[in-house]
Swiss-Prot record:
This is Uridylate kinase. The keyword Transferase applies. Residues 23-28 are annotated as: Involved in allosteric activation by GTP. GO terms for molecular function: ATP binding; UMP kinase activity. Transmembrane segments: none annotated. Catalyzes the reversible phosphorylation of UMP to UDP. Its EC number is 2.7.4.22. Disulfide bonds: none annotated.
């Protein structure tokens, strides 16, 4: 397969799950995984790609158990937002150590820790070649970090939301449970809904669909996969309004 000489995308929103930062650990952040991800983002910056990043918080906080024990959902979601800020701080530090200029913006004010989210400033920073990490989700409870990724992607006019996961695309069934599950190279928004394929929560997915924001699902744990996606090689599963034949 021939490699495209130029990147397929100019500006992207990279969504990473908090769990991806755990590596083989059961909790927290694996420094080796963090540094590898920072190096992969650095490769994109060196290619001239404008990179926005949203990271989940599931490696540091999971509210389901506490919610079942009676914790208020709003309180739990606020704690989850703070977990994404912690991951964002770690990623910003890893990027700085890799000599990549990065800015951390939070949807909730955290004076002295990171900048407040500002749409116009974020776009200006991206144009100047800085990586912008968007933390604290949307700043609202009841909204997932997938929703935050789609929202920020739409706001910064990214060409695609890249969703880094533990699997290398979208399958007909859970490949962890059924080894005969079929992987899709490309699928439409309508097919995802019709076949009830698991990509992200419905609110996030319909936001992307309504604003014609393509989503590309790939395995962030696979070395080099992110670069292959950016160069337009066959990697992961592309979701958009219509298939290109």
């Amino acid at each position: 397969m021939s490699t495209n000489p130029k990147p397929a995308f100019r500006r992207i929103l990279l969504k990473l799950s908090g769990e991806a930062l755990m590596g083989d650990e059961g909790f927290g952040i694996d420094p080796k995984v963090l540094d590898r991800m920072a190096q992969e983002v650095k490769e994109l910056v060196e290619l001239g790609i404008q990179v926005g990043v949203v990271i989940g918080g599931g490696n540091l906080f999971r509210g389901e158990g506490l919610a079942k024990a009676g914790m208020n959902r709003v309180v739990g979601d606020h704690m989850g937002m703070l977990a994404t800020v912690m991951n964002g701080l770690a990623m910003r530090d890893a990027l700085h150590r890799a000599y990549v200029n990065a800015r951390l913006m939070s949807a909730i004010p955290l004076k002295g820790v990171c900048d407040d989210y500002n749409w116009a400033e974020a776009i200006s920073l991206l144009k100047s070649g800085r990586v912008v990490i968007f933390a604290a989700g949307t700043g609202n409870p009841f909204c997932t970090t997938d929703s935050a990724a789609c929202l920020r992607g739409i706001e910064i006019e990214a060409e695609v939301v890249l969703k880094g996961t533990k699997v290398d695309g979208v399958y007909s069934e859970d490949p962890m449970k059924n080894p005969d599950a079929v992987k899709y190279d490309e699928v439409t928004y309508a097919e995802i809904l019709e076949k009830e394929l698991k990509v992200m929560d419905l609110a996030a997915f319909t936001m992307a669909r309504d604003h014609d924001m393509p989503i590309l699902v790939f395995n962030m744990n696979k070395p080099g996969a992110l670069r292959r996606v950016i160069m337009g090689e066959e990697e992961g599963t592309l979701i958009r309004a219509k298939k290109v034949i």
